[in-house]
Amino acid sequence: MVQPLRRGVRPLTWTRVLPRQTRQPASSHRRAQARYVQIRATPTDQPATVNGSNVPIVDTPSSAESADARFEVIGAPYSLLSVTLSASQNLYTRRGTLVGLSGKADNVISTLSVLEPFRRAPVGVPFLYQKISSASPVTALISTRSPVTSFAVVHLNGSVDWMVAQRRALLAWTGRSLSIRPTINTSLSVAHWGSSEVTGRGLLALVGSGQLYSVELKEGEKYIVHPSNVVAYTVSSKPPRPYRFKSTSLKLQVPGLKSLPTFLQNTQFIKAMSETDSWKTAMRIFHTVRTWSRMTIWGDRLFLQFDGPSTILLQSRGARMSDVLSTQEVNEFASTPRGLTIVPTKQEEKQKGSEQDGKDDVHKAPGTRSVDEIEQEIKGVTQSIAVLTKEGKVVFQKPGQQ
């Protein structure tokens, strides 16, 4: 019995595992091949350097307070808005964003308000808001349905007006003298299409995609930013202007009849073809393809230039180009040369017009005197005496001559 057991039993082999410190050669070889990458968050209280100028890019304030209300952004990353209202103070918030409310619920009155639908609907600005008022102080929580949004609060003291650039950035506001007017694009300006001008005194709550940051520009400073990342900015005497970067571009030209010679344009065949439905449909398709290519392929060149002093609220995740710019604006920017597209003011136009009129008057003014008259004026006035001779001839003599 013992022999079979001994045959089936094998000695156990073991290996001693040395600590990492004792394996100096292998450890040093592995350490030489390793690459250490250290990632640290950039402090937001330090100004960022842009083209040699210190342009501070900081986080938006988390709270704002007035005499009758207080807005405070809570949560990480900024997912809730806490609103503290005093008695008889009105709060306007977007429909479906109220999460909860603390206080005497019997004193709270909630009504659905329709704010200027005929002015807001054409530009895509929401016009259904919930009006909340209470006879006693209450605290409300407000949120949005999107999981990638953050809040920013703005305190308006009446000295500086704000322009909300994004159509759905306005979430809530309060203030008895606060006025919000939607602006309609009438002059193809990117700064006022689908925007809302905010004036007066009160508190404003804005929402953006991703994280919101504030850019402070001083006098003489300039900043170029993509329009889809601009949430709001202060209204100043220097509105933002469109800017295009230099890059290689493929020009798409829509075939037109004006490019043909003049004798071909006047033919009956060309005139009849331009009036057909097939030609108009083809032109419409060509224009649509050109606009789509400008929005998708060359859309990164369309920017806005802000001049200080100004405050800009930016969102880290930009919206679609079609949500910010209209097709007419895209075609207008793409057709302009690179650089800053400056729109002349009325005063400059009047000054140029008066100068041009003066030049035209100088060129068109008829001469009042001939060359002979001018030469005669330079030489002076001379006097001659006509003398009739015996032969019947008339001879002109100067005075004193015999």
Curated annotation (Swiss-Prot):
Keywords: Mitochondrion, Transit peptide. It is found in: Mitochondrion. This is Altered inheritance of mitochondria protein 24, mitochondrial. One of its GO terms (biological process) is inner mitochondrial membrane organization. Coiled coil: none annotated. The keyword Mitochondrion applies. Residues 344-372 are annotated as: Disordered. Residues 346-372 have a biased composition (Basic and acidic residues). The keyword Kinase does not apply. It comes from Emericella nidulans (strain FGSC A4 / ATCC 38163 / CBS 112.46 / NRRL 194 / M139) (Aspergillus nidulans). SUPFAM superfamilies: TRAP-like (SSF51219). GO terms for cellular component: mitochondrial inner membrane. It comes from the Eukaryota. Residues 1-36 form a transit peptide. InterPro entries: AIM24 (IPR002838), AIM24_sf (IPR036983), Trp_RNA-bd_attenuator-like_dom (IPR016031). Belongs to the AIM24 family.
